[in-house]
Amino acid sequence: MTVVYGARMPGLLLYKEELAACELRDDIDLNITVDRGDESWKGKVGFVPNICRDISPSVENTVALICGPPIMVRLTLPLFFELGFSRENIYTSLEMRMKCGIGKCGRCNVGSKYICKDGPVFSLAELDQLTGEY
């Protein structure tokens, strides 16, 4: 499994203990990056889409899971299309659409789905079937 995890700066990285444990595993290729490093940062510096481009994962037996700020998702999606990923094998999370989180307010309704109850993770193929803005 290959993981690309990014943050704006080192101090904003979450799950540091869990990431340290993942770095010890042979079955996880962990790529941690920050947009802006500081003098203490020894890791990669760069945007998630650029790190993904450098890795260039094979589409064979692979799915892409993209989670993050909308701008990062928008910049990363075209890369996976360029690499040949199908819309069925690209997943993203729409939790930013949720308000109440229990399906009562209707604010996260997109087509026939409630993001809070039916998601928040959907493939792009699933999202294509929904009407409305996502």
Where are each of the predicted segments found?
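Short acidic, gly/pro-rich beta-turn/loop elements at beta-sheet edges
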Residues: 13, 102, 126
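Alpha-helix termini
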Residues: 19, 81, 114-116, 132
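FNR/FR-type flavoprotein reductase catalytic core
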Residues: 1-99
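Short Fe-S-cluster ligation motifs
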Residues: 106, 117, 122, 126-134
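Local cysteine-cluster metal-coordination motifs and their immediate loop/turn environment
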Residues: 71, 95-120
